[in-house]
Swiss-Prot record:
One Pfam short name: oligo_HPY
Domain ABC transporter stretches: 6-257, 287-526
Keyword set, alphabetical order: ATP-binding, Nucleotide-binding, Repeat, Transport
A GO CC term assigned to this protein in UniProt: ATP-binding cassette (ABC) transporter complex, substrate-binding subunit-containing
Binding-site residues, ATP 1: 42-49
Family label: Belongs to the ABC transporter superfamily.
Gene that encodes it: yejF
Keyword Repeat: yes
Binding residues annotated for ATP 2, in chain numbering: 319-326
Protein name: Uncharacterized ABC transporter ATP-binding protein YejF
Domain of life, source organism: Bacteria
Any single GO BP term: oligopeptide transmembrane transport
Naturally occurring in which organism (per UniProt): Escherichia coli (strain K12)
Amino acid sequence: MTQTLLAIENLSVGFRHQQTVRTVVNDVSLQIEAGETLALVGESGSGKSVTALSILRLLPSPPVEYLSGDIRFHGESLLHASDQTLRGVRGNKIAMIFQEPMVSLNPLHTLEKQLYEVLSLHRGMRREAARGEILNCLDRVGIRQAAKRLTDYPHQLSGGERQRVMIAMALLTRPELLIADEPTTALDVSVQAQILQLLRELQGELNMGMLFITHNLSIVRKLAHRVAVMQNGRCVEQNYAATLFASPTHPYTQKLLNSEPSGDPVPLPEPASTLLDVEQLQVAFPIRKGILKRIVDHNVVVKNISFTLRAGETLGLVGESGSGKSTTGLALLRLINSQGSIIFDGQPLQNLNRRQLLPIRHRIQVVFQDPNSSLNPRLNVLQIIEEGLRVHQPTLSAAQREQQVIAVMHEVGLDPETRHRYPAEFSGGQRQRIAIARALILKPSLIILDEPTSSLDKTVQAQILTLLKSLQQKHQLAYLFISHDLHVVRALCHQVIILRQGEVVEQGPCARVFATPQQEYTRQLLALS
């Protein structure tokens, strides 16, 4: 007989503002058995994360109010538990993995110090005994050369590596229940498969229950025993995974299942001139040792990449985290040093100084993965979008800048009336539209898109892809699209490059590479997607 590990009973949660309370979770009931995985699925703003954070009472009160219902762990109430009881549960019996590891990891401490803190606090282990367990756990979550990485700080890891460290930190305590809030969003498909397999193995070993919050339905198919679908704070459908995918009953569930990226890239203009020509691009970071931090070697992270990109064309750059995708983008932007040839619209860029690059900067723009990090929270939307105009078109008046901001907000599907609001007042998809508007207002020829849809749920992701296609067709934009989501790459890209550990494994027309991959590594990626 299965044992009920966690029971959420008719939970309603609200946020108080002055005299009014806005209900964000409304009468939700969920149950997780020991050894079972329940997937919680829904768009951003549907109440998934608020429900999960309520389990350990991690939401600030005020403004949060628990309006009704209860949450029971092994039959004991968590909503009414003392702080001392909760301290014994948090991170020990119930562990949590958050979506954004840069927020969760301490930037001032090494990996070893942060991981040891978990074992010291929850299991009373001494440093010598803990080191072996830390190395074993890092190795299991796929951190290469774990012993050498213990002295690294979070900023020295790729996004995927940081997420793997977060997962290792949560699993060190061998919890009874794991709450995973979008834990594989930043990971490529091969590492994603490793992490899912690891979670399944640990679940079997520990008989661990798991609440898995995600917008990736392919993961839900592979991992979940049961699925609960949330919309506007309510649980609209709940069933066994196989049944729900085969015959969804609620219209919203049906909409979610039909939101996978699809379609073809926009037709290339004829003739399409070469906009970007890259030859033998190489990036190496110095390795420093000793008291004087002398350079003793170099870590080559991008090795001799060559490609051309035409006006109106999209080139997909695909690979595992740490494969050199984002580093390649930074090198093309001349934000880090590199070797090789970069020619943009006939102009060699490598030997230009900062002042010489300035007139070219507005023609090459970038949209980053996480708008939470790339948008200044202290500026309103008008100030964020017009910032580039202040640098590149300083003669414009404030009124002229505002008119251009209004026009570009219309173009990306944002209400210009919201231009005086701040980033925190928008959803994830809206924030990404703000980032696209900021790039678009300078009328670029090339936009480097670094995982622009990976943190978005499927329905919003489809909307952003449609927007990118329409903007490309209208303005003849070239895109360098960095991604680990092969479904998105197939729908958007004309050409594709597969990277592994900084080297090109395969490149060519997207349709050909997806239909008849020549390399085993490419076939593995396609099989996992």
